[in-house]
Amino acid sequence: MPKDDEYEHTIYNNVEGKPQVIVVGAGPGGLFAALRLIELGLRPVVVERGKDVRERKKDLAQISREHRVDPESNYSFGEGGAGAYSDGKLYTRSKKRGNVDKILNVFCQHGASTAILVDAHPHIGTDKLPRVIENMRNTIIECGGEVHFKTRMDALIIEQGEVKGIETNTGETFLGPVILATGHSARDVYRWLAANNVTIEAKGIAVGVRLEHPAGLIDQIQYHNRSGRGKYLSLIHISEPTRHSLI
């Protein structure tokens, strides 16, 4: 773990007995929401349909080796979200998200290298990210919160037009205000919301394309190019609001 004096430390106090808030999803949105709730003196109860980040890795291997997919534990669902087993790059192309220093410092507090605080293109790394995610979960639990795996939200509890909690596939209900951090693959959640007249709003999407090249060609471009090394990320503006990114 990095030393405390190498990053800005956030204090997470014990929130046992405090009002609870239900967080649906243990991806980056859900984990950071839970940590922020603790900062505000509220008790997070995180409900995740998939498995913890270590157990989930076995299900990902099963996809590659046996071509069998667990619908609740895969690349989309499980602790850490869809990016848990990507290469751990941290960046945003949005100009509207404000300062991200707090986010980077929280990552460092939970085991990420402090190099991400100064690197132009911060990168945690696939090998280190699961441990960072586990440490975030441990912070939530040690502060009095809860994390429930293999627990899928099946419905909101709505009384007189107000959300009072959630029902789950285990038969257990959780009461309190609800934060939905389900990710874009939880189509069953969005179908339920639409069918039950809960206001939802569509947002723009990003479609990525990965091109594979011979290693020799990439070496030539990156290390033997008289014009210098290619940029890590470049943007080509074709027409607004469309934006094309080349990585």
Where are the regions that the model predicts?
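Extreme N-terminal leader/targeting segments of oxidoreductases
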Residues: 1-19
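Beta1/beta-strand and adjacent pyrophosphate-binding region of the FAD-binding site
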Residues: 16-27, 45
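Short hydrophobic core segments
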Residues: 22-24, 153, 173-183
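N-terminal Rossmann-fold NAD(P) dinucleotide-binding loop
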Residues: 30
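Conserved N-terminal/central alpha/beta ligand/cofactor-binding core
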Residues: 55, 61-146, 151-152, 203-210
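A conserved short coil-to-beta-strand element within the FAD-binding core of flavoproteins
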Residues: 149-162
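Glycine-rich loop(s) and the adjacent beta-strand/alpha-helix scaffold that form part
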Residues: 180-229
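Single conserved hydrophobic/aromatic residue that forms the stacking wall/gate
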Residues: 236-247
